[in-house]
Amino acid sequence: MTAFKACTGHWKPIFRIAVLCFCVIASPLSAGTPTVTKLQSTSRDYVLWYRNFDSPAIRALVELALQKTSEYGDFQVIRSEALSQGRALRELTIGQSHLVDIANVATSAERESVMIAIPFPVDGGLLGFRVCVVLPESLPKFANIENLEDFRASQVRIGQGAHWPDADVLGANGIPVVSHSRYEILFRMLQKERFECFARGVSEVLYDLEMEQNPDLVIEPNLLIAYPMPSYLFVAPDDQETAHRLQLGIERAIYDGSFSDFLESYYARAVKDLNLEQRVVIALENPLLSEESRNVGHRTLENLRRRLNILSR
């Protein structure tokens, strides 16, 4: 019995690489698949939140969706100012902001109520599968953790962004959280031992460490923290055109296979290098999701086993 089976018992080993688990989700934008009549050709600049712009995978997905919808006109994706996540989402929420047009963040019922979500997990749902970035001297604290009760008893503190839904998810599961509003500062706080684990998504952690270039930071090798946490593209509540364009573009990419190619290109390496299938899974509940996103998230967790088998080949 693998570590995964031991910890997850009821999870069924069924998966189709990140596409079929959500390509039939009902859209909040319309009653069915959005259709586009012939549009007057225009050109538009789309300001993408700087953290997403700096992520090759997220920027590539946004550009893929825009490329698939040429009837909307030419486009250019521009890097936003260095806004905190909270500031970027506030700018989107108020609408008509010139500072940011698109942001990819973890979803929550509250976020979906004040912005338009494009309801496709951009990384196939991998954001909800998290590993710990740690200092080497902290590794013994993780050695005997086999389940959530062990994790709580270890008194390991997890660092997270103050505006991230993850902080509330972890807290709701009885895990102590230390937070800061700036992502970059959290790495410094880890080095100063303000907490023991900086939990980062499987889809982002290798890129994070490549950018940090800090030999004092390592990835804890045995644990995988898992909870339903779909990561969506969000736009302002009054920007229906961008929402429809992004959704239509992603749907077209799913149906022509280029979305699968995108996932393979940007995320297969992480699954292989992080040895996810052999890790002990610490399964958490996420009380923050809307009913729709809860269904998406749980489907993703239930399909984890086959996801890992496919991507690790």
Model feature map: region roles:
Residues K38-F53, N144-H163, E196-C197:
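Short loop->beta-strand "edge-of-pocket" segments that line small-molecule binding or catalytic clefts
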Residues T35, G161-A172, I250-R313:
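Ligand-binding clefts/hinges and TM-proximal coupling segments of bilobed small-molecule sensing domains
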Residues F120-D168:
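A conserved helix-loop-strand patch within extracytoplasmic ligand-binding domains
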Residues G125-V131, S138, E210-Q247, R269-E292, ...:
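Periplasmic-binding protein-like
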Residues I78-V100, A172, E184-S203:
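Short helices/loops that flank or line small-molecule/ion binding pockets
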Residues T93-I94, D101-V114, C197-L217, L224:
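A ligand-binding cleft/hinge motif common to bilobed small-molecule-binding domains
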Residues V62-Q76, I145-R152, G161-R182, L209-N214:
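Ligand-binding cleft/hinge of the Venus flytrap
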Residues T33-V114, L246:
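Extracytoplasmic small-molecule ligand-binding "clamshell" domains
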